[in-house]
Amino acid sequence: MAAAYPWTLFLGMLVMVSGTMGAALRKPVDVAFGRNYVPTWAFDHIKYFNGGNEIQLHLDKYTGTGFQSKGSYLFGHFSMQMKLVPGDSAGTVTAFYLSSQNSEHDEIDFEFLGNRTGQPYILQTNVFTGGKGDREQRIYLWFDPTKEFHYYSVLWNMYMIVFLVDDVPIRVFKNCKDLGVKFPFNQPMKIYSSLWNADDWATRGGLEKTDWSKAPFIASYRSFHIDGCEASVEAKFCATQGARWWDQKEFQDLDAFQYRRLSWVRQKYTIYNYCTDRSRYPSMPPECKRDRDI
């Protein structure tokens, strides 16, 4: 699948054109790790560089590691730059996600599934609402995510959740409460990232196992941007709801250009979409038509 990596002329044209959600997203603010995040486990497997502006997560046969945000948030724009585990990364998973803290939790997931050397990474996204997930989408990326840092971002407001890679929307999940589909709106979420061994499922359904002779596996991070409405975990609303930039009209839907970008990702790089899986869902889930993500 080497063809999944090269930049195409079409993408080059897209990048030169400006526009996201009818208006540009606020540019991420590059801040050090310690400004917004703390380690959560295996502290000795996190390495710090450039005064904490860049970190590495290390995975070996004994443990992986991870970190989480200091605060909990209801809505906002969250991003970080990541460079994934290079070489033979089969069996490893690098995750960047938002999650609340109870049994009926909400969750917004980026999961990067490692692969054998020369085979492309798979990016899996998922959305959990009220404890229910099963909304997986999988894509290849149009570049090698192990060579350089790239931005991975989530825009979350009362109207939709947008997953972005270098400002290209790869997925949208609309608020479809009127269709009986739960939407994350009242459970503050922390932001997490981790690197761990998942060779029971991550690569070819668990057929490819982690080669520990290649350890340590290293994922790199920088630009730990959070622009969100911070709340206590007991809060059921955001005190500034409606007043933040992400609440404004131009961020309530993708614009035509953004839908063209999303369609390009769907047509060129999507390898699985729950919306089109009739074996799992004989009837299309109601949110899929509204998301225009089919």
UniProtKB/Swiss-Prot annotation:
Induction: Down-regulated in developing tension wood at the primary walled stage.
UniProt KW Glycosyltransferase keyword: yes
Reactions accelerated catalytically: breaks a beta-(1->4) bond in the backbone of a xyloglucan and transfers the xyloglucanyl segment on to O-4 of the non-reducing terminal glucose residue of an acceptor, which can be a xyloglucan or an oligosaccharide of xyloglucan
Pfam families, per the entry: Glyco_hydro_16, XET_C
Catalytic activity, EC: 2.4.1.207
Sequence positions that bind xyloglucan: E111, Q124, T125, N126, D134, R135, E136, D200, W201, G205, R280
GO molecular function, a single term: xyloglucan:xyloglucosyl transferase activity
CC per GO annotation: apoplast; cytoplasm
Similarity comment: family membership: Belongs to the glycosyl hydrolase 16 family. XTH group 1 subfamily.
Protein name: Xyloglucan endotransglucosylase protein 34
Species whose genome carries this gene: Populus tremula x Populus tremuloides (Hybrid aspen)
Gene of this entry: XTH16-34
